């Protein structure tokens, strides 16, 4: 599960993933976090 700080971060993450980037790389460049929990800590959920 990915958690992003805002909609812009989510858009960057999704675009990166669509382009073939790994979850880790896309999370790093977008400011998102990859977590194992089912809910995001004070981040918008997707």
From Swiss-Prot:
GO-annotated molecular function: toxin activity
Transmembrane annotation, as ranges: none
Function noted in UniProt: Thionins are small plant proteins which are toxic to animal cells. They seem to exert their toxic effect at the level of the cell membrane. Their precise function is not known.
Organism placement in taxonomy: Eukaryota, Viridiplantae, Streptophyta, Embryophyta, Tracheophyta
One GO BP: defense response
GO cellular component entries: extracellular region
Keyword terms of this UniProt record: Disulfide bond, Plant defense, Secreted, Toxin
Gene3D superfamilies (UniProt xref): Thionin-like (3.30.1350.10)
UniProt record similarity statement: Belongs to the plant thionin (TC 1.C.44) family.
Name this protein carries in UniProt: Viscotoxin-1-PS
Organism: Viscum album
Subcellular location as annotated: Secreted
Gene: THI2.4
């Amino acid at each position: 599960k990915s958690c992003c700080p805002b909609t812009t971060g989510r858009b960057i993450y999704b675009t990166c993933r669509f382009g073939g980037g790994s979850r880790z790389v896309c999370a790093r460049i977008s400011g998102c976090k990859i977590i194992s929990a089912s809910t995001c800590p004070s981040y918008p959920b997707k």
